C-alpha cells in the first residue's frame, strides 16, 4: 500500500521536471533569440497548464501503475497503446540521459572530472533501491530545496524589467518548443500510481506543481536576460551566473540531481506496467521494498549507454518523441471526454501537432 500524499505529488512534479534543463536551455534560448525570449517563457506557463490538464484527467481514469499509456490503450486500442508505451518509455530514458548530461556540463564549469554523470546515476540508483519510504523522504527534501535555490539564484543576481525585448512570434514559438523540454514530464507523475494513498492527489499535485514550475522558470529567465552578457558561449554564461559562488554551484547540482532522482524513480514504473500488460517480461512486475527494481536497473543501464551522445542530441530525441506520445494521449482524452476537458485536449492536440510540424520544418530547412 503506497504512502505518498498530495504534498508529495506536488514535490514529485517539481523535482521530476525542474532539473538541469532550465540552467542550460534558458541561457541557450537567450543565445539563440535574444531578450525576446521572456515572452516565450511567460506564454509557456499557460501552454504548460493547458497541456498538463489532460494528464491530470487521464490519471483519474487508470487503476494501476504504469502511466497514461494505459488510458491510450483503453481508448485507442492495444496496438496504439503499445506504441504509446514504448515511445513514452524511450522519451523518458532520453530525457533522463539529458538531465545526467546537464549535470556533467554544470559540474565541469568549475571542475574537470570524467564520468561524473556515471557516478551520479549509480548513486541515485542505490538510493532508490533502498525503498519507497526513502524515496518519499528525499522527494520532500529535494522539492523544498529546489524552490529555495532557484529563488536564491534569482534574487542574488537580480531582475531588470527594462531588459525585456520586443515580442517576436517566431522567437516566442521556438522558445516554447525548447522550453517545453524542461517544462514537460507530466507522464512521470502518473506512473507510480500504487505509491499514492489517494489517486486524485496525482491530478491535483500535477497542476499545482506545473504552475509553480512555470513561475520559477520565468523568474530565472528574467535573471538571465538581466545579466545582459555579450558572449555566444553557453559555458561563459553559466560561469557568469555562478561566479565564484561554490554554494550556488552546489545548489544547481543538487537541483539537477533531484530531477534525475525523481525521473529514475517514476520511470521505473513503466517497465513494471508494461510487464503487467505483457509488453515486457513478467520479471519486471516484481517489487522489492515497494520499488520495481528491475525497471530501475534497466533504465540505469540504458542511461549509461546513452551518455555517449551530447546534451543537444538527447534533448532533441526526447522532445520529439515526447510530443508524439503526448499527441496520442490528447487524442485519447478528446475521444473519451466531454465538456471543458474535451476542448482543452483539442487545444493541447493542436499545440502539440503544430510544434511537431514546426520542428520538422525547421529540421528540413536547417
From Swiss-Prot:
GO terms for molecular function: amino acid:sodium symporter activity. It is a multi-pass membrane protein. Coiled coil: none annotated. The chain crosses the membrane at residues 14-34, 37-57, 87-107, 111-131, 141-161, 173-193, 205-225, 247-267, 291-311, 314-334, 346-366. One of its GO terms (cellular component) is plasma membrane. The keyword Membrane applies. It is found in: Cell membrane. Its main location: membrane. Keywords: Amino-acid transport, Cell membrane, Membrane, Transmembrane, Transmembrane helix, Transport. Belongs to the amino acid-polyamine-organocation (APC) superfamily. This is Putative amino-acid transporter MJ1196. It comes from Methanocaldococcus jannaschii (strain ATCC 43067 / DSM 2661 / JAL-1 / JCM 10045 / NBRC 100440) (Methanococcus jannaschii). The lineage of its organism: Archaea, Methanobacteriati, Methanobacteriota, Methanomada group, Methanococci.
